[in-house]
């Protein structure tokens, strides 16, 4: 099979696009997402990255987005970190531009499927992948098949109540912002041995541990 694929990871911070052959990324592009811009400008940004990668051998395009998705129709709803993206017919828009099939799903689902097929979890049939970033979510593979639930939202664990808020507040970048810093800044301070930053990461790790315990349902 000489065909190639393009994978796109859309986030509120960055947009990444990779040209993939035989399960391996042969070229990767990344740039800051125009998250505060109108809907069409963000679509154009994605299309621009795809346009730099596409060749006649590209058979299909896959896109992961941080939101619930009507996967059958490729409609994206209420994307985290991109206020203008409330209802975007992403599949139709990109298929018209490039003339190849476009598949859209929740980014955590894409993450879980990739790890279970090509990554560290390829030897396992049941997998839960937790993604941490601007928010927190999970992708679920059961019996080797991706489990999406309704509107691809089966792994939307961030909104589950936890302490006085929810898991997303304590297990994402919001945790650091709520304490007057950022994950990157706290990381750099911790590397330098700052006791306050080390304590902050210790607390953050505790919240992640409780999230994992909740997923595993251990006694």
Per-range role (PLM):
Residues 122-174:
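Glycine-rich phosphate-binding loop of actin/hexokinase-like ATP-binding domains
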Residues 28-30, 79, 149:
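Residue-level detector of high-confidence beta-strand sites
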Residues 102-107:
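General beta-strand structural signal in soluble alpha/beta enzymes
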Residues 74-87:
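A charged helix-plus-loop insertion that forms the helical arch/lid used to bind
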Residues 1-61, 69-75, 91-100, 115-126, ...:
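ATP-binding/phosphotransfer module of carbohydrate and carboxylate kinases, centering on a glycine-rich
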Residues 67-71, 110-112, 137:
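Short, active-site-adjacent cap segments at secondary-structure transitions
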Residues 33-35, 84-85, 154-156:
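A short acidic/small-residue loop/turn micro-motif
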Residues 15, 64-65, 135-136:
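Short loop/turn microsegments at loop-to-beta-strand junctions
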């Amino acid at each position: 099979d000489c065909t190639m694929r393009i994978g796109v990871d859309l986030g509120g911070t960055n947009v990444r696009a990779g040209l993939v052959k035989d399960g391996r990324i042969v070229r990767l592009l990344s740039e800051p997402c125009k998250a505060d811009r109108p809907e069409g400008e963000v679509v154009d940004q994605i299309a621009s990255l795809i346009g730099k990668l596409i060749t006649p051998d590209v058979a299909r395009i896959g896109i992961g987005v941080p939101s619930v998705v009507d996967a059958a129709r490729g409609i994206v709803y209420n994307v985290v970190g991109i206020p203008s993206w409330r209802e975007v017919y992403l599949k139709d828009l990109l298929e018209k531009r490039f003339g190849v099939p476009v598949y859209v799903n929740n980014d955590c689902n894409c993450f879980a499927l990739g790890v279970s097929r090509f990554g560290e979890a390829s030897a396992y049939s049941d997998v839960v992948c937790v993604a941490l970033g601007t928010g927190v979510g999970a992708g679920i593979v059961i019996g080797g098949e991706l489990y999406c639930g309704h509107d691809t939202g089966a792994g939307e664990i961030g909104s589950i109540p936890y302490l006085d808020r929810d898991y997303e507040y304590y297990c994402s970048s919001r945790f650091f912002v709520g304490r007057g810093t950022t994950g990157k800044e706290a990381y750099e301070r911790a590397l330098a041995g700052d006791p306050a930053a080390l304590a902050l990461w210790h607390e953050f790790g505790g919240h992640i541990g409780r999230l994992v315990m909740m997923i595993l349902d251990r006694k």
